[in-house]
């Protein structure tokens, strides 16, 4: 390439600051690990959902895919979630959607599946073949979002907002359990029977409820 067609050199900083490698590695690793923990891998204790799961449910709510309506193509849900809320691969979004609809993977499913959602031995069909809609349990997680019950934050492109966590009438973290592997941290929590949870504390007092994570 001729010299006059080469791209201009970037405008580097005029001052070079010496930083010990150990300090830079420690600081950069901490920032990266916190990003992975809070943005992808570890569920939020307030609703028991990872960001991708929460964004799928919120996207379906916005699309009007409710329990009393028809099923819609999973491909539409994956595309809307990826375009508006979760700028990552479609396979990761679809895997999370499918798992929320598998009754052998969840005590209480949040997705009502239609089509081949897989089994213990076989993977699900491609998202262009399967359909889904929210369950009543999912609606209990999403209820009262429009009543200033939770904090909202801007989406990745700043064009809209999304809930930081869901109101969560259903104790999803306890009922469905959770698992996640992040950078330097992992979590695994077994599911619990909903009837047992209700029997354990059938009439909690206001003081008890105020200390629960979802009230933070």
What are these regions (language model features)?
Residues 1-201, 205:
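Catalytic phosphate-handling regions of large nucleic-acid enzymes and associated NTPases
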Residues 203-206, 210-216:
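Positively charged, low-complexity/disordered segments
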